[in-house]
Amino acid sequence: MLLPVPLLLGLLGLAAADPTVYFKEQFLDGDGWTERWIESKHKPDFGKFVLSSGKFYGDQEKDKGLQTSQDARFYALSARFEPFSNKGQTLVVQFTVKHEQNIDCGGGYVKLFPAGLDQTDMHGDSEYNIMFGPDICGPGTKKVHVIFNYKGKNVLINKDIRCKDDEFTHLYTLIVRPNNTYEVKIDNSQVESGSLEDDWDFLPPKKIKDPDAAKPEDWDDRAKIDDPTDSKPEDWDKPEHIPDPDAKKPEDWDEEMDGEWEPPVIQNPEYKGEWKPRQIDNPEYKGIWIHPEIDNPEYSPDSNIYAYENFAVLGLDLWQVKSGTIFDNFLITNDEAYAEEFGNETWGVTKAAEKQMKDKQDEEQRLHEEEEEKKGKEEEEADKDDDEDKDEDEEDEDEKEEEEEEDAAAGQAKDEL
């Protein structure tokens, strides 16, 4: 008798474990978030977050999130959860970001802090474990940060991961695995992956150049050399510019007044430029010398690069020039499949309706602008007609006054006679 696979795995104790959700925040309970999220008091002028679904959305309630509300401000807000270590298990960090303000410069990333963080004093120099998410500033910076704190030093990824820079909601996912590999996804599609050791400078290089090795003095690494049998032709050297043979001294040229006449110069058609001997293959060429490498005595492998003793706080510690960014659908779990499913059930469900609403607003705005432009032209034409009528009335009035003055003058002349 064949047993179903799930039942068989269960009997063998091999059934997949349920996902562990360490932190999840969707802001579905109105102002309840204010009890879970703590504002830092490190600076008195930190920007304020408000709960909003923005100017356009797929679902007004489901799409509500934390929105930055003040321009040119630093922001510092965090939420605490039960501490856990990712040692021996996968870590997945996921959230959505929406830059509906068409952001010009500002962060859209999160930071994961250890349990020792004082949330009321969180600031830009507070030590964190991981920083992940988009950062935009002008046309030159549109990247996804993936920064790990390793032995007290913040280490940046060696690759450039481009972030989304439009006005719609996007899903960002970071996966860190116990085999020291990682994956970055945007909108549930992989955009980067690889090895932690290869893509970050956590460790000294495995190999270094042998300090005792040097290129031999007789090593010839010239692939081409001058042909020793080649010589410059006798008629090669010609001046680059010559007097114009067709130029003539003007007839009215006065040498006492104008000085000695000199014809203008022109490009010499026989000028050949600098002579260089032709190149031939170097018979002594040995190739490019490669510096020999040796094992780096400073290198020591670390199988626990990925692991942290504890995570306990998720924070939004960032700067924005133009406010309006909305953060939502935060998730920290140990299950990649669950995170993907959660993303599809949140961002995935509302993204199409969000775009439809934005497209409708854009179309309405376009029609409104066209109508305003049309009204402006009509008013301009009406003003022009009014000015023309006014000018005609003034001309008629002037003609009438002139006629009256002429009649008065004629009457006065008649009386004098």
From Swiss-Prot:
C-domain as annotated region, ranges: 309-417
Locus of motif Prevents secretion from ER: 414-417
GO molecular function terms noted in the UniProt entry: calcium ion binding; carbohydrate binding; unfolded protein binding
Annotated glycosylation sites: N179
GO cellular component: cell surface; cortical granule; cytolytic granule; cytosol; endoplasmic reticulum membrane; extracellular region; sarcoplasmic reticulum lumen
Region (Disordered): 193-270, 350-417
Repeat region (Sequence), residues: 191-202, 210-221, 227-238, 244-255, 259-269, 273-283, 287-297
Record flagged with keyword Signal: yes
Binding positions (an alpha-D-glucoside): Y109, K111, Y128, D135, D317
InterPro entries: Calret/calnex (IPR001580), Calret/calnex_CS (IPR018124), Calreticulin (IPR009169), Calreticulin/calnexin_P_dom_sf (IPR009033), ConA-like_dom_sf (IPR013320)
SUPFAM superfamilies given in the database record: Concanavalin A-like lectins/glucanases, P-domain of calnexin/calreticulin
Residue segments, region Interaction with PPIB: 237-270
Keywords annotated in UniProt: Acetylation, Calcium, Chaperone, Cytoplasm, Cytoplasmic vesicle, Disulfide bond, Endoplasmic reticulum, Extracellular matrix, Glycoprotein, Hydroxylation, Lectin, Lysosome, Metal-binding, Repeat, Sarcoplasmic reticulum, Secreted, Signal, Zinc
Positions of region (N-domain): 18-197
Chain intervals for the UniProt region annotation (P-domain): 198-308
Region (4 X approximate repeats): 191-255
Modification N6-(2-hydroxyisobutyryl)lysine occurs at: K64
Domain remark from Swiss-Prot or TrEMBL: Can be divided into a N-terminal globular domain, a proline-rich P-domain forming an elongated arm-like structure and a C-terminal acidic domain. The P-domain binds one molecule of calcium with high affinity, whereas the acidic C-domain binds multiple calcium ions with low affinity.
Subunit structure comment from the entry: Monomer. Component of an EIF2 complex at least composed of CELF1/CUGBP1, CALR, CALR3, EIF2S1, EIF2S2, HSP90B1 and HSPA5. Interacts with PDIA3/ERp57 and SPACA9. Interacts with TRIM21. Interacts with NR3C1. Interacts with PPIB. Interacts (via P-domain) with PDIA5. Interacts with GABARAP. Interacts with CLCC1.
Function, in words: Calcium-binding chaperone that promotes folding, oligomeric assembly and quality control in the endoplasmic reticulum (ER) via the calreticulin/calnexin cycle. This lectin interacts transiently with almost all of the monoglucosylated glycoproteins that are synthesized in the ER. Interacts with the DNA-binding domain of NR3C1 and mediates its nuclear export. Involved in maternal gene expression regulation. May participate in oocyte maturation via the regulation of calcium homeostasis.
Protein name: Calreticulin
Gene: CALR
